[in-house]
């Protein structure tokens, strides 16, 4: 209801009864009541207007929020598209920063790898030179040792051949084959025809060396003693006197090889031990035991590094004598 409607006078009734008496106090009360009614209606109208304005304001605020949110989304999307474009072009700051860090790490790893390669190459070259020198030295040592061993073997074979020759000369008479005297009997008439003997002819006499070198040398010395001429007996010596006792045999030493060691004169000798080697002609040599075999030992002279082979039998018979000496 508008304010004009509130202020317009009410329509008069069609047929009104007789007017009552007029009193000024009643008129004032009537005006006061009308004023109260108008003020009440005005307050109601203001409240309705305020409610309507608040509703419109809420709708307007919601529209502004939606519009603002849409604007923020568009701005964010535009920023991401711009960053994507910069990334594809390679001009994005974050991309350049990370690429710079990766490039630095790459260069550092390449430098470390090159240093490691150089270090390993130098180490391999040093090892190669060292191994090459060791191989050359070992080759030269083996060559010298092989030469010495071959010379020693040839010398030993030469001595064996000389001993065989001497043995054949000493035992030549016993090797002569004497004809066997046979008697042929007359064949009886009923005896079968004799079948010729098809047995093989005996092989010519030959020496079978089934003895050790020490035993052979001992036998040779015995033969030499028997072969030497005997002195004639003195005519004044009575026949009943006992004969002069034979020369006492040579002194024998205890010598043997066990577990790669030489046991000689109540002492043990091993490989690489420094010794003195004395021969029967009073020659004293400074030597080192280079190896210990089954029946012999090899010694190396410290003066010229030549090697000699000494048999256990020679040590037992005293042909060579071994003495200890300090390694210095």
From Swiss-Prot:
Post-translational changes noted in the entry: Polyubiquitinated. 'Lys-63'-polyubiquitinated SUDS3 positively regulates histone deacetylation. Regulated through deubiquitination by USP17L2/USP17 that cleaves 'Lys-63'-linked ubiquitin chains.
Sites bearing N-acetylserine, chain numbering: 2
Biased composition (Low complexity): 1-22
Residue positions, PTM Phosphothreonine: 49, 244
Record region (Sin3 interaction domain (SID)): 188-226
Chief subcellular location: nucleus
Start and end residues of each stretch annotated as Disordered: 1-69, 226-252
GO MF annotations, alphabetized: histone deacetylase binding; identical protein binding
Location of the protein in the cell: Nucleus
Compositionally biased intervals (Acidic residues): 23-37, 45-54
Cellular component GO terms, alphabetical: nucleus; Sin3-type complex
UniProt KW Chaperone keyword: no
Modified residues (Phosphoserine): 32, 45, 53, 228, 234, 237
GO biological process: apoptotic process; blastocyst hatching; chromatin remodeling; negative regulation of cell migration; negative regulation of DNA-templated transcription; negative regulation of stem cell population maintenance; negative regulation of transcription by RNA polymerase II; negative regulation of transforming growth factor beta receptor signaling pathway
Coiled-coil ranges (or none): 66-171
Domain comment in the entry: The C-terminus is involved in transcriptional repression by HDAC-independent mechanisms.
Function description: Regulatory protein which represses transcription and augments histone deacetylase activity of HDAC1. May have a potential role in tumor suppressor pathways through regulation of apoptosis. May function in the assembly and/or enzymatic activity of the mSin3A corepressor complex or in mediating interactions between the complex and other regulatory complexes.
Complex and partners: Interacts with HCFC1. Homodimer. Component of the SIN3 histone deacetylase (HDAC) corepressor complex. Interacts with SIN3A. Interaction with SIN3B enhances the interaction between SIN3B and HDAC1 to form a complex. Component of a mSin3A corepressor complex that contains SIN3A, SAP130, SUDS3/SAP45, ARID4B/SAP180, HDAC1 and HDAC2. Interacts with USP17L2; the interaction is direct. Interacts with FOXK2.
Protein name (record): Sin3 histone deacetylase corepressor complex component SDS3
Gene source species: Mus musculus
């Amino acid at each position: 209801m508008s304010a004009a409607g509130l202020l317009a006078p009410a329509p008069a009734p069609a047929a009104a009864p007789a007017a009552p008496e007029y009193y000024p106090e009643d008129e004032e009360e009537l005006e006061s009541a009308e004023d109260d009614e108008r003020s009440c209606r005005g307050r109601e109208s203001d409240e309705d207007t305020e409610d309507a304005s608040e509703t419109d304001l809420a709708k307007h605020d919601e529209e502004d929020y939606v519009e603002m949110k849409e604007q923020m989304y568009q701005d964010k999307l535009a920023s991401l598209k711009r960053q994507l474009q910069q990334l594809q072009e390679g001009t994005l700051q974050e991309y350049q920063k990370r690429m710079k860090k990766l490039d630095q790490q790459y260069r550092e790893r390449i430098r470390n790898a090159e240093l490691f390669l150089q270090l390993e190459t130098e180490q391999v070259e040093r090892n190669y030179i060292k191994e090459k020198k060791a191989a050359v030295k070992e080759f030269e040592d083996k060559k010298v040792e092989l030469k010495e061993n071959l010379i020693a073997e040839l010398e030993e074979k030469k001595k064996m051949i000389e001993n065989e020759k001497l043995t054949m000369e000493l035992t030549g008479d016993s090797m002569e084959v004497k004809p066997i005297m046979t008697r042929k009997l007359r064949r009886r008439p009923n005896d079968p025809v004799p079948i010729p003997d098809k047995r093989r002819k005996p092989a010519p006499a030959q020496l079978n060396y089934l003895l050790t070198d020490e035993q052979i040398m001992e036998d040779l010395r015995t033969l030499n003693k028997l072969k030497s001429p005997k002195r004639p007996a003195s005519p004044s010596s009575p026949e009943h006197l006992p004969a002069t006792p034979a020369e006492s045999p040579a002194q024998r030493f205890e010598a043997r090889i066990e577990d790669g060691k030489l046991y000689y004169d109540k002492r043990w000798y091993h490989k690489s031990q420094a010794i003195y080697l004395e021969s029967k002609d009073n020659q004293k040599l400074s030597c080192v035991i280079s190896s210990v075999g089954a029946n012999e030992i090899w010694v190396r002279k410290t003066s010229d590094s030549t090697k000699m082979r000494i048999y256990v039998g020679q040590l037992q018979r005293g042909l060579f004598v071994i003495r200890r000496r300090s390694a210095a």
